[in-house]
């Protein structure tokens, strides 16, 4: 996926709290400032999340994967973490790479494209609205699962189906590994399971 994890090996699971950023221009910046003042929220969307995120949220920030523009640093991440959020996914950069790998953030993985020491100049234009991450549309409230192996987004309505599939896949892989260790079947019959072994797997599962 091209994302790096500040906490390698730590899996991120939660609900998507989305935000989208664009390069600034004077009229857009003025409009954003007006909306923020009228709504009494911080126009810096990471700061808004540090005030509004709910426990279990995963902040999902679309920055277009652009080099040289980042979302936040240590302070912003700490604010979001203190709200009980599960982590952050940034289709762009972040600051304070060394600090964000500190043990203080051991349970707060940040999946990001790159790190950059400069303060971002990009402007938040949408909050809790559809965003695009790696060519995938993400809606607010979608379930997020991410680690070093990749990032998955799916509608919350599919949670039970996805969990059932994950459980079955894990059980099948365990069954296949046991068959390999027993050395009683050919590899081609184990991976994928032959009809005979598939039937045996289903019998054991039930």
Language-model-derived ranges and their functions:
Residues 48-92:
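Extracellular/luminal Protease-associated
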Residues 90-91, 96-146:
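A contiguous pocket-lining binding segment that forms or flanks enzyme active sites
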Residues 143-182:
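A hydrophobic, small-residue-rich beta->alpha segment in the mid-to-C-terminal subdomain
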Residues 1, 21, 60-62, 70, ...:
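General beta-strand structural signal in soluble alpha/beta enzymes
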Residues 1-39:
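N-terminal low-complexity or amphipathic/hydrophobic leaders
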Residues 3-4, 43-47, 130-132:
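Short alpha-helix capping/helix-loop boundary micro-motifs
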Residues 183-206:
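Acidic/histidine-enriched, glycine/proline-rich intrinsically disordered or flexible terminal extensions
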């Amino acid at each position: 996926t091209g994302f790096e994890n500040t906490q390698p090996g730590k899996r991120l699971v939660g609900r998507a709290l989305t935000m989208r950023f664009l390069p600034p221009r004077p009229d857009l910046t003025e409009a954003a400032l007006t909306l923020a003042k009228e709504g009494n929220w911080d126009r810096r969307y990471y700061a808004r999340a540090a005030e509004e995120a709910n426990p279990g949220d995963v902040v999902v920030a679309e920055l277009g994967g652009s080099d040289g523009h980042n979302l936040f640093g240590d302070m912003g991440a700490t604010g979001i973490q203190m709200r009980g959020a599960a982590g952050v996914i940034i289709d762009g950069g972040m600051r304070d790479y060394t600090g964000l790998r500190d043990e203080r953030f051991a349970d707060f993985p940040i999946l990001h494209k790159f790190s950059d020491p400069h303060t971002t100049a990009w402007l938040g234009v949408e909050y809790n609205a559809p965003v695009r991450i790696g060519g995938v549309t993400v809606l607010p409230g979608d379930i997020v699962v991410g680690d070093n192996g990749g990032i998955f987004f799916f509608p919350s309505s599919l949670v039970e189906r996805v969990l059932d599939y994950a459980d079955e896949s894990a059980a099948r892989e365990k069954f296949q590994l046991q068959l390999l260790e027993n050395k009683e079947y050919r590899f081609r019959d184990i991976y994928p399971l032959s009809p005979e072994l598939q039937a045996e797997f289903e019998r054991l599962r039930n």
